[in-house]
Amino acid sequence: MNIVCLDMEGVLVPEIWIAFSEASGIPELKRTTRDEPDYNKLMNWRLDILAEHGLGLKEIQDVISTIDPLPGAKEFLDELRSVTQAVILSDTFEQFATPLMKKLGWPSIFCNSLEVAPDGRVTGFKLRPQPTKLKTVQAFQSIGYDTIASGDSYNDLGMIQASKAGFLFRSTEQIKKDYPDIPAFEEFDDLLAAIKAAL
């Protein structure tokens, strides 16, 4: 039995924090897991910036409502789910992901959760056990699944390397250079073909 585990941001949808950075005019918020492997450190830094600027969940959700999946992402996911089981493993948050999952046809997603005060301030976050994606893949394997994984960032490498097949998708030149043994693709058709060949 196979299950395909996909990253979300940068693979199926644009990076939420980059979109919010551009909309809010705060360039520091462009930093993502492509730049900072320590997710706890990255999120605490983001929360400090939000507090400093008086921004909360509503402002972020307003930007997310304008984001569409990457061109071809829904078609890729529909075709993939017609031939095998697939799940999205993301370090994003339920409060961010829901409108994007609707646009992608409601695929299954495992992600984290924000702690939000009554006034909408983001006060903290609850992460699944770290490293989340690797531990989720290992859990699938422990119940009899063969995993195939794809992502674009440092926090995807664990699940990619632990799977029977793993692929980088639209990753950075630095990550591709540092991990030349991981096949890297730029187009959904090529990724889909590689996944189908690994099934």
Regions found by a protein language model. Name each.
Residues 1-2, 150:
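Short loop/turn microsegments at loop-to-beta-strand junctions
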Residues 2-113, 117-118:
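Alpha-helical substrate-recognition element adjacent to the catalytic core
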Residues 86-91, 145-186:
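Acidic, Mg2+-coordinating phosphoryl-transfer loop and its flanking beta/alpha structural elements
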Residues 94-98, 156-157, 192:
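Short, well-ordered alpha-helical microsegments
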Residues 95-147, 178:
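Substrate-recognition "cap/lid" segment bordering the active-site pocket of phosphatases
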Residues 110, 182-191:
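Short acidic-hydrophobic, aromatic-tinged amphipathic segments that line or gate anion-handling sites
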Residues 193-199:
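Short amphipathic alpha-helix with an adjacent loop that forms part of the alpha/beta core around
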